[in-house]
Amino acid sequence: MSTYYNDHLAAAEKDISSSNFCNLVDASVMLYDEEHRDLLPKKVNSRCQAKTKKQEKESDKRFFDLFPKKRRTSVVTVRNPEQNQQNLHRVSTSSSLLDLNTIPGDSSDPRNELQGLLSSSSSSFLGDYERKTPQNASSSSTLLAEYNTEMANPPNPNSETSLKRKHSDSEPKKAKTPYSWKGREAPEWLVKMMGTMQGSEGPRLIYEKTLTETDVKPVQSRLLMPFNTLIRNDFLTPVELRILLELEDDTDGVGATLVDPWEVKWGVILKKREMKKYSGKGSLNYAIICGWNDIVEANVLEKDDDISIWSFRRGRNGILSFALVLPPPPDMA
């Protein structure tokens, strides 16, 4: 009897424990379902939002890829520790200029507060200026005093200093003094050249001139030598002089040889040319033509160049010859 009772009790306990376990399992499943049901919309929403943001980023990336990007070079800035300290001090100084959060009380005078702020800001500014310009011996207060003095007492335009300045500005620049061979010996190269050409007479300085624009123009093709500006006019023989006076053709004249500083010989013609003016009066001139353009080009002659013409005779027949002489270098003048 007792054995049957014990077996029945054990079976009952087993059924109770198995039913309790099933109930616990069912309760845990129901709790999990409820929690999962609450979290599912949140996960879905978060996934949708993440997907939307990803699509927006990809869209922006595709949009900016349409434009070329500018390459930027890497710049390495080496900062000076002293400069950093000055910057920090400048920041602290500028921050002390005006504190907007400081509101004066009802008992304080706004004008006194404003005056204090202005005085502190001006002193800070002057301190910064003095620190930035340590090499300047004058202080900022001296500069302000000088500025106020200049504004109060402007310079007098009629003072002696101002008049001297105006006079110096209005004075024309001195013209270049042309080089002259007067009273000087003939250049050495010309003397040697006469020796090789069997010179029999000369050399003689007959003319000096600062070249004009017409003297170097290819259209004119002549060197004009006014008769009244000749240094000497006895370089022609009576026969040559009569030929020049009798000839009326512009292309005829007395044949001669011209030697340049490079010791190159050129065939030229000396011609008489009468220049008539609007007043009716005329002037007599000698002109070296027929080959003058080649001489200008070979010797690179330009307007305002100083030249001199020398005459000499060569050979047994005393053929008329000229020499083109330029000023010597400055160190030999």
Curated annotation (Swiss-Prot):
DNA-binding region listed in the record: 220-328
GO molecular function: DNA binding
Location in or out of the cell: Nucleus
Location of the region described as Disordered in the Swiss-Prot/TrEMBL record: 76-179
Pfam families (UniProt xref): At2g31720-like
Gene3D superfamilies (UniProt xref): DNA-binding pseudobarrel domain
Keywords assigned by UniProt, alphabetized: DNA-binding, Nucleus, Transcription, Transcription regulation
Ranges annotated as biased composition (Polar residues): 76-99, 134-143
Predominant location category: nucleus
SUPFAM superfamilies: DNA-binding pseudobarrel domain
PANTHER family: B3 DOMAIN PLANT PROTEIN-RELATED, TF-B3 DOMAIN-CONTAINING PROTEIN
Name under which the protein is recorded: B3 domain-containing protein At1g32030
UniProt organism field: Arabidopsis thaliana (Mouse-ear cress)
Highest classification ranks of the organism: Eukaryota, Viridiplantae, Streptophyta, Embryophyta, Tracheophyta
